[in-house]
Amino acid sequence: MITIISCLANIYFVYRSCSTKHFPSFKEFAESRFSVRTFSPKPVEQEKIDALLRVVQMAPTAENKQPQKIYVITKEEDRKKLKTVTKYAFNAPMYFLVCCDKNKVWKHQTEDYYSIEIDGTISVTHIILEAHVLGLGSVVVRSFQTEKIKEVIKIPENMVPVALLPIGYPKEGSKPSKLHFKKNDIKDFVEYL
């Protein structure tokens, strides 16, 4: 089944959905996704991991510098280490630690600004949306000790962690948190000039 899932930057991407649902709009697709915090122990198949990594290749970055680096964490011993740096590991069967190389990111010519957070977050968005297409759950975690996660995962100094993504099959009965349904009114975040 072909499902249109994204209109990021006014470009529509068409994906072949693994589910039986058809979403006629990106809005409906986005409304159906929620942060999953309870996971089945079932491992994620390599072909699905590869599909998640392929959408990172498509993520736009400033000047196409492509500073992203994804650390795929599947070994049990490494997953246990994550519990020492965050209380939000959620016992997922795998994690993506999304980082950006501070030596490769775009730097503003006159201001002290780097594209680390934006470039990394666009990759995060691509991953969590593709995970939903593949029937996987995910949640974006930034509540971790930055230097400690670099130490336990053994990533180089030039890599800046942007987000930790617990990923896996949602446990039966997984449902959105109450906060998921709290949305600001459009008039509260838009101002026409």
Feature map (PLM): residue ranges:
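C-terminal helix-cap and adjacent tail motif
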Residues: 4, 8, 18, 22, ...
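A glycine-rich helix N-cap at a beta->alpha junction
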Residues: 87-96, 154-176
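Glycine/small-residue-rich phosphate/adenosyl-binding loop
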Residues: 48-122, 151
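Short secondary-structure boundary segments
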Residues: 100, 143, 169
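Structured binding elements
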Residues: 135
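Active-site helix/loop module of the DD-peptidase/beta-lactamase fold
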Residues: 141-158
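Short hydrophobic alpha-helices that are characteristic scaffold elements of the AMP-binding
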Residues: 129-132
